[in-house]
Amino acid sequence: MITEGAARRVHIIQGEYKVLSDPNAVLSTILGSCVAACLRDPVAGIGGMNHFLLPGSATSPTSGGDATRYGVHLMELLINGLLKQGARRDRLEAKIFGGAKTISTFSNVGEQNAAFAMQFLRDEGIPVVGSSTGGEHGRKLEYWPVSGRARQYPLTGAETQRTVALEQRPAAPQKPVETSIEFF
């Protein structure tokens, strides 16, 4: 058995997802109001995690068009990434984490994120086998995608505020898609 110290750690930041089949890998992230969905196919031995800032989609008029921040986009990418690597939709299971109410003056986007993730998975027929959402403090999350094991650590008030500051920054710019064709 591999000890935790020997695990290959892959950190997921806001707007990212990762799919792995390495039994020695652990996915990690830090969440405030953001949500991480952890999905896996226990038979295929493959799993993954995403980290999204807002529910909904980038097509709404107020979104700014950055799809990587939105739950709809990242949930689809995660599910499709699993299916492309051999998972079967009918065997997928999920765990949901995050969605804290980290700033009292803002609307409760964390609650909206968690509700969105639960509804999305319900609509897709993917059972949620575990969750830890809400509260007033952020979390550090570790997820072993092959075994489905998850562990979280609550953040202190100061750590939560640092996480909130990171979540409010714009997502990293995406590389432009090459749309021109050059003929020789």
Swiss-Prot record:
Coiled-coil ranges from the UniProt annotation: none
InterPro entries (alphabetical): CheD-like_sf, Chemorcpt_Glu_NH3ase_CheD, Cytotoxic_necrot_fac-like_cat
Transmembrane segments: none
A single GO molecular function term of this UniProt record: protein-glutamine glutaminase activity
Signal peptide extent: none
Keyword NADP belongs to the record: no
EC number in record: 3.5.1.44
Function: Probably deamidates glutamine residues to glutamate on methyl-accepting chemotaxis receptors (MCPs), playing an important role in chemotaxis.
Protein's UniProt name: Probable chemoreceptor glutamine deamidase CheD
Organism field: Rhizobium etli (strain CIAT 652)
Chain's gene name: cheD
